[in-house]
Amino acid sequence: VAAAGQSTEEAGKQAAKGLEQFAKGLGMLAGGATGDSKPVDPVSFHDMQALFPNVDGWEKHKPTGERMSSPVSYSEAQVEYTKGDARIEMKMVDSGLNQLLLMPYTMFLTAGYEKETSDGYEKSTKVNGQPGWEKWDSSSKNGEVNALVNKRFVVTAEGRGIDDTKILQEFVGKIDMVKVAALK
């Protein structure tokens, strides 16, 4: 009976810790982590497209983009790279500091999430010096690496037909995060 009580107590402590981390994430959202972040107009997707790198050995296709100002403002730029059967799509999204757009990411990063299955994993991590997360599915050879820059921009590399997430880390590593953070 005591063992069962301890295990219930331990489960309660873990649940309380999870709720505390969840509340911390919501607090960061409400105040933009500093309390002084207010939504701004997203940058032009053309400005973000200019930051997509050329990568040796990969064919870079024509970038695309879109921007919307209502009901939720955001801007997104994309480009696809191919090498044989492998494909990598880079995306850059400007949330305009709209914390509702960033809620899933902020909570994921705050919680220090990690999950592993027989086919792969998901985890929060550092990506090119930025808070980020990584997913890998070994059965399909698909992966994703994301970085949150300046509490505003999300930089993503999604790969299909690749060997592991190292190549995705390399692609994101070629993005100048200082220039991304300075976009206005």
Descriptions of predicted regions:
Residues 23, 27-30, 52, 56, ...:
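Generic secondary-structure transition motif, activating predominantly at the C-termini of alpha-helices
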Residues 34-138:
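Short, solvent-exposed recognition patches
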Residues 11, 15-18, 22, 44, ...:
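Stable alpha-helical elements in mature extracytoplasmic
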Residues 19, 26-29, 48-51, 97-102, ...:
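Generic detector of leucine side chains in alpha-helical contexts
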Residues 1-40:
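Low-complexity, Pro/Thr/Ser/Glu-rich flexible segments characteristic
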